[in-house]
A protein has these predicted regions:
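Secretory targeting and sorting signals
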Residues: 1-30
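Cleaved targeting-peptide boundary
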Residues: 30-37
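Low-complexity, acidic Ser/Thr/Pro/Gly-rich terminal tails and inter-domain linkers that flank the onset
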Residues: 37-64
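Hydrophobic core residues within well-ordered beta-strands of beta-rich domains
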Residues: 50, 67-69, 119
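Beta-strand elements of well-folded, non-transmembrane domains
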Residues: 58, 75-77, 127
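Short, well-ordered beta-strand segments enriched in hydrophobic/aromatic residues
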Residues: 65-77
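The feature marks short-to-medium sequence segments in extracytoplasmic or secretory-pathway proteins
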Residues: 74-119, 148-150
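Short, surface-exposed ligand- or partner-binding patches at beta-edge/loop junctions that are enriched
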Residues: 122-147
Length: 151
């Protein structure tokens, strides 16, 4: 009887350690990947995957509250389309600015890329009445921050 109780307690303790180990090893799903400007991040996209590189974040220079980022999208697999609407600029106070809608002559093309090809262009943010942004965030369709680029 004594041996049975010891074995039972040992089994419960071992199961507890296994669960604790699994929880400790699980990645934090809410934490976005943090990168410096100029680094790339691979992001799944409808039709494949894209390596995005955000190189800059700066005011347009026209004193109009518009900021821009230079972005390169390279198709890693399939024929994905860059999802420009998933980019946002963010300030240190958490103010978030959506990308401006509409095609721009120097904008990042919103069309499918063939595997291995890339496109480079600008994405623009309307920051007219807010705090200057310091980062660019890629937020998926579910509203989860996936990647944050900043200096």
């Amino acid at each position: 009887m004594q041996l049975s109780q010891i074995a039972q307690k040992s089994g419960v303790a071992a199961a507890g350690f296994v669960v604790a180990g699994m929880l400790a090893a699980a990645p934090a799903l809410a934490d976005p990947e943090g990168l410096d400007f100029g680094q790339k991040a691979e992001i799944p996209s409808p039709g494949g995957a894209i390596d995005y590189t955000v190189s800059t974040l700066e005011p347009s220079g026209h004193n109009d509250g518009v900021w821009y980022s230079d972005v390169t999208a390279r198709a890693v697999s399939g024929s994905p389309t860059p999802n420009i609407a998933d980019f946002n600029a963010r300030a240190v106070n958490s103010s978030t600015y959506a990308v401006m809608k509409g095609d721009k002559p120097d904008g990042l093309p919103n069309q499918p890329l063939t595997a291995g090809s890339q496109a480079t262009g600008r994405i623009y943010f309307d920051v007219r009445s807010g705090t200057a942004p310091d980062s660019v965030v890629y937020r998926d369709a579910g509203g989860t921050d996936r990647v944050v680029w900043k200096d």
